Amino acid sequence: MSQTAAADAPKPLDPQLGGAAIAPPPTIPDPSTLILRLLTPAEKEASWITNSVSWAGRLTQTDYFAREAANEASRLLRNGGIRFWGLTTEKEGGEIYAAVETLKKRVLVQTSKGFDVEDAYGIASVYTPAKYRGNGLAGTMMRKLGEWLDTEEANCRFSVLFSDVK
């Protein structure tokens, strides 16, 4: 093989970098074409795999999953108290471009006549996979979530965003 042909030949993949290191940048659809919808159980677990890279800390992936499942089953969150959302396409099983959780709580709201019991939502675990960051997807997702919170279905008196970003 000539030196020119050798120089033009594909380089073997570096096992430390893997295929993703040489893959072209991901194609990101126009954010206005994406929808916010509840994730299926399989999609929820896929989002846990994705965000565990940033959030598991010293936990193994198995321990991270166990913690998330325990949180979901806790008395405060079971029976629909937590919802897992994804910014994605219409179809189930499509790419999840960003994800977020909502935690529904009954709260006391003081009024001039006393107290009312209302629904409120905590917004937590806002996450965009690294390959999609910097494209406004989290902002799009939060706008769409805000629109849902304003619906009669949500019946949301107010919401609060939880963040551990330092």
At which residue positions do the language-model features occur?
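Conserved acetyl-CoA-binding loop-helix of GNAT-fold acetyltransferases
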Residues: 125-128, 133-150
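Short amphipathic alpha-helix that is part of the acyltransferase structural core
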Residues: 2-98, 104, 112-115, 122
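Conserved GNAT acetyl-CoA-binding A-motif
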Residues: 142, 149-164
